[in-house]
């Protein structure tokens, strides 16, 4: 073989090597790119805000885990687009109304609700996303942040004096009355009373979404689940799914604020009979700084899951206030009043469980909605508040 032929062969071989190397490098780069984005599991684009609801993160509360030797996790419902677990409820109530023909997408429609918590905000956001209007009746002592947010969202707000459920002017009754008046007006505008306390769309959405998410995120390894109870939808839906559907033998605990009747109902069965749920007895509003949970009557949503609740733990306002400050300082979790209640209960439950057990609590909403009431007091708590101080108040 001549020298020139030899050089040509070497040149061709070298080019082939370069080509093969380029292909391999490209393939490797493509593989790494694929693995990077597959691992990160970046979600697809959403068609609207309503599609962002659900699939909320589960995060370990490191300070409480370290203090107890039990893994304590918070299901961050505050990460929903309108900021609370009530986003799920609002969306499911409205979608159910659409399925029944009570609301029609693209046509004028109003959603009425009576709420002292975050449900009104969730309804306002979902209504705006789907083309409806929101009318919210609430106690006139509702936190200023929630009032301002509702008004900023364009909801019609009807403030009423706090009253017993048997009072026709109580906020739930006021919402139902306003809805009926619009229906009777004859102007053809559709109107729906959300009725979160009695509407089964409430507990069902937690059975269909929140419960399965928790089971998946914990791989079914959950020893205790803790939630407060206002309407009863969250604790019923999640507990019913975990115990009945997933067959997970976890201990379900209802965390109850001072002044609420669920503690006695769950532990001693003495609130009052289910047949009296419509409120034949006059009762005052639950006496607590906590918003969104606690009640002195039995709702349909609570009734549907009562048999799945094993225990109730009562938490007072001082414990809740201190726990909120503790979580903010030690974990960077700026939470609302009901989440603080759940966290206090988690510490109590952790004492009864073996080392390394898993507890999940619901983190309902952010402290930003409680600045003028709950956090007005919580911010005054000493920065170095200890867990012992929280529990022993």
From Swiss-Prot:
Q: Catalysed reaction per UniProt? A: O-acetyl-L-serine + hydrogen sulfide = L-cysteine + acetate
* Gene Ontology annotations for the cellular component aspect, listed alphabetically: cytoplasm; mitochondrial outer membrane; mitochondrion
In this UniProt entry, the residues modified to N6-(pyridoxal phosphate)lysine are: 86
Q: Where are the transmembrane segments?
A: 12-31
Q: Name one GO molecular function term.
A: cysteine synthase activity
**Which GO biological process categories is it annotated with?**
cysteine biosynthetic process from serine
The entry's pyridoxal 5'-phosphate-binding residues are: 230-234, 338
Q: Which PROSITE patterns match?
A: CYS_SYNTHASE
Question: Keywords in UniProt for this one?
Answer: Membrane, Mitochondrion, Mitochondrion outer membrane, Pyridoxal phosphate, Transferase, Transmembrane, Transmembrane helix
**Which co-factor is required?**
pyridoxal 5'-phosphate
EC number(s) on file: 2.5.1.47
Q: How does it sit in the membrane?
A: Single-pass membrane protein
Q: Which Gene3D superfamilies match?
A: 3.40.50.1100
Family statement drawn from the similarity comment of this UniProt entry: Belongs to the cysteine synthase/cystathionine beta-synthase family.
**Protein's name in the database:** Putative mitochondrial cysteine synthase
Question: What is the organism lineage in this UniProt record?
Answer: Eukaryota, Fungi, Dikarya, Ascomycota, Saccharomycotina
